[in-house]
Amino acid sequence: MKIKHEHIESVLFALAAEKGQAWVANAITEEYLRQGGGELPLVPGKDWNNQQNIYHRWLKGETKTQREKIQKLIPAILAILPRELRHRLCIFDTLERRALLAAQEALSTAIDAHDDAVQAVYRKAHFSGGGSSDDSVIVH
């Protein structure tokens, strides 16, 4: 399954909005080289050059060569993306992931309901004449 150039562009700009283009370019470069990449002109410590290549040349995707260079970086990009941004890429939009997200939402709702119930018991015990201010409230 191929990830569209526009989707990679979107997540990289979103990550750069949070961390900065230089940070993202450096992280991609380090991961690309760690994974054995060496074909692209990315050099550790050359933050400005790496940022220029990734964000201001290749990510534009105006030519086939630019898009191909970004495709070569995809394994490194996937490795550095935080979970909040990975979902924007089609390869992560699976039935299993949707089920896990639904379960996560259900768990969050259950936790909120639990906390609301504890708060209601506490309020009733302390503010409705159900006890003096020295009484403790125990919830099991």
UniProtKB/Swiss-Prot annotation:
InterPro entries: YdaT_toxin, YdaT_toxin_sf. Induction: Not expressed under normal physiological conditions. Expression is repressed by the transcriptional repressor RacR. Disruption phenotype: The toxic effects of racR silencing can be observed in the ydaT deletion mutant (where YdaS levels are elevated), but the ydaS-ydaT double deletion mutant shows complete attenuation of the toxic effects of racR silencing. One of its GO terms (biological process) is FtsZ-dependent cytokinesis. Gene3D superfamilies: Putative bacterial toxin ydaT. Keywords: Transcription, Transcription regulation. Pfam families: YdaT_toxin. The keyword Membrane does not apply. Encoded in the Rac prophage region. Transcriptional regulator that causes a severe detrimental growth effect and reduces cell viability. When expressed, it alters expression of a variety of bacterial regulons normally controlled by the transcriptional regulatory protein RcsA, resulting in deficient lipopolysaccharide biosynthesis and cell division. YdaT has no effect on Rac prophage excision. Overexpression of ydaST reduces growth and leads to loss of cell viability. May contribute to toxicity and morphological defects. This is Transcriptional regulator YdaT. It comes from Escherichia coli (strain K12). The gene is ydaT.
